[in-house]
Amino acid sequence: MVANNKGLLIAGLLLSVIGAALFVISLALLPSVLNVATNNAIVDAVIVDSFKSQRYNDWAGQKSVDNYFKQYYYLWNLTNPNEVLNGKNCNFEKIGPFNYKYEWNNSKVSFSDDGNLINYIQSKSYKWIEGEDSLNPFTVSTTNFNPAYLGLLSTLSKNSITLGMTAEDLLYTLASAPQTKQFLEYLSSDNFTMIAYFYNGPKYFNQQYQLLLSTINNNLTTTPTIYFLEQWSNSTIIPTNGNSSLWDNMLISYGLDSPSGISLQSALEILNPMNQYSLLNSTNGISYWINAVFNGPNSNSYQILEQELGINQAQLTLVMIWWLKGFNDQYTMSQLLKQCEIESIELLGVCQFITTIPLGYKSISQFNITNLPWLEPIEIPIAMGTNLTISTNEAQSNLFNDSIDDSLLTIHGLGLFLEQMSTNSNNFTKWNLTNNDAMTMIGYFLSYIPNTTGYSIKSVQSFYNTSGLIVTRTANEWLWDCQDDLLDYLGIDQQCSFQQNNTIFKPSTVYTGKKDLSLTNQYQQFQEQSTLTIWNGTVNVTGFVENGQMAPLVQDNLPQSLTIFEENILRPLSLVHSSSSSVMGVSTQRYYLPNQSFPIDPVFNNSINGFANLTGLFNGVPIYVSLWDMYGVPIEYSSLYINGLNQTYENAEIPLDLEPITGNTLYYNLKLQINLQIPSNANSLWFSSLGNWTNIFSPTNSNSFGIFYPSLKIGQTATASTNDINLLKQQFKQIQTVKIAPVVVVSIFGGILLIAGLVMAINGFRKTFYNNNQYNGYNIIN
């Protein structure tokens, strides 16, 4: 019995040794197999190299729907605008946040290089998130400097120096283009045609009346004049006496069911040129009739004519309709077309503008017309004292045609026109003008409109409350939906809000990581560019796309920095590794954007530490991007003149938490600030002495770049959804399962052998020990 127990012990020990050896072997000899299995699982879960990839839908945009990608804003509110305009420092407060859910959609997708590259077009959209701590962007308003106006002056200053004027004075001059367009629109309107009819109609009526009177025979019980007045006012058919063709459009009741009922005495008063209320009186009567037509039956002029002429409202209206639509359309129009040498009445206004023929060589400003905005002559011959030698048709085709880029009714065309003078080329063949005519036009635009009458100055300054240097707008207008009235008036198609919604970009190409995991989700081309051409030197498009996916499987060789291509400022930015971190129970690595991410760099036009100069990207708008509250910017360009900034690292830091196995960014908070510049020489180069801004503070340091005013703070962050975190944990669990799967038979079998051997050994030992003790104990007792 003892021998059997010893055999059991020996066998158990042998089995346990074998089992332990197998278990150790399973862990020591198969790590390469495990890593391959794990890597393949991660690659399958991360790499998007075909439409069938596991994460294709997430990459295409579903990820932005399922997770909360938040873009949030704080607007800077200028609390003392009037003091600032009088030379005081600015006091700012931040208003917000205004939270938006940010989503993207990738479309027109194609793969190339055997799935190593993916080409796509991306669109982005932002939707305001009501609730949380978000303010309502549609009801909250703030006051600040207007980027549209600053951009306008900044752009104009490049040319105004050559012309020897300030940017604002050049603005007044160029505003002559839309001002002239406004003149011509009025002169080409039905209202002006009616004025021309009222002015010229009496002459041609008298001619027609004399012709007709000569054909009326004298076999009447009354005089031909009385007969004409009776027929003119009440005949509903062509009279039998007189030439029938000459009666055409000479009868106010013609074709009506019943006569007008106007008395003979009233008819005599209406058509008596000596009566100051007469339709044919060119001294006072013309003003009464024009104002009555323009201002309607309730106007004072209408009522005066009714009373003085002894007719009622219906009768007066009937006379007006006949005069404008009957007589003048037939007789006066043809004469005006002939005099102006034009084929269409639509060019009558241009004829008046360059010749003054339609109003008998008089300006429209000379007529006593209620609510007429032109108090001084606006026509070129009267304003300049000389006529142009070109015809009306030539002027319309070459100078005032809205459909051509060089039209003098646009600030672009007028700018080109003035440039010919500033460069002394005097080449105006583009407009088919002689030098004399060109000098007349330049004198008109440079001197007469801006400075003599103030038309263009007043027109520009009329927009200053809503479109000037400092304006008040809702948050929604500042961010997305700004309508700048001054830009619209000038015909400038330029966005005046800081952001764009539902934008569709040019195609981009990204590495999928199929051939090189380190390139996963890095740009090859950003919007068709592999090298950016907007900067002063070569800037290659490099870095990860801003959608949160970095290179996977970096846990064993953790990168000390991550380079992201920042789409808003068009340059690569590097974040440096800081420490370990954790997001919702998942181990991550924390990275930060360094403080000096925008150093002085001539390639990027950066002249001040902490400011990214984006003026060239935004059509001359002097935009400078910084960290929040201008953190890292020297005080002489920030807190020295700006009150309300919170320049602390904790406020401005930009963190990113990377899960290094999958390469997923589980948390980040990108924070940038938009600032606007007013240069130190703005008072001498930008602002006109005729304007409102010359008292604004300007640093006395001649080397200063001016003052930079904060506009808005932009933040973008993302928090993975609970579902995504749970899915990530499940993937880790699956990866762990994949990891042990190849050795499960060996390890489990080895473990069983180990356990069985230990059990057998223990049992054998126990039995041997029991028998030995039993034997010894018996001897003792005994």
From Swiss-Prot:
It comes from Dictyostelium discoideum (Social amoeba). May act as a lysosomal receptor. May be involved role in macropinocytosis and fluid phase exocytosis. Glycans are attached at residues 77, 105, 191, 219, 234, 243, 281, 368, 387, 401, 427, 432, 451, 465, 501, 536, 540, 595, 605, 613, 646, 692. Residues 1-7, 761-782 are cytoplasmic. Heavily glycosylated. It is a multi-pass membrane protein. The lineage of its organism: Eukaryota, Amoebozoa, Evosea, Eumycetozoa, Dictyostelia. This is Lysosome membrane protein 2-C. GO terms for cellular component: cytoplasmic vesicle membrane; lysosomal membrane; lysosome; phagocytic vesicle; phagolysosome; vesicle membrane. Residues 29-739 are lumenal. GO terms for molecular function: scavenger receptor activity. GO terms for biological process: phagocytosis, engulfment. Belongs to the CD36 family. A motif (Tyrosine-type lysosomal sorting signal) lies at residues 777-781. It is found in: Lysosome membrane. The chain crosses the membrane at residues 8-28, 740-760. Keywords: Glycoprotein, Lysosome, Membrane, Transmembrane, Transmembrane helix.
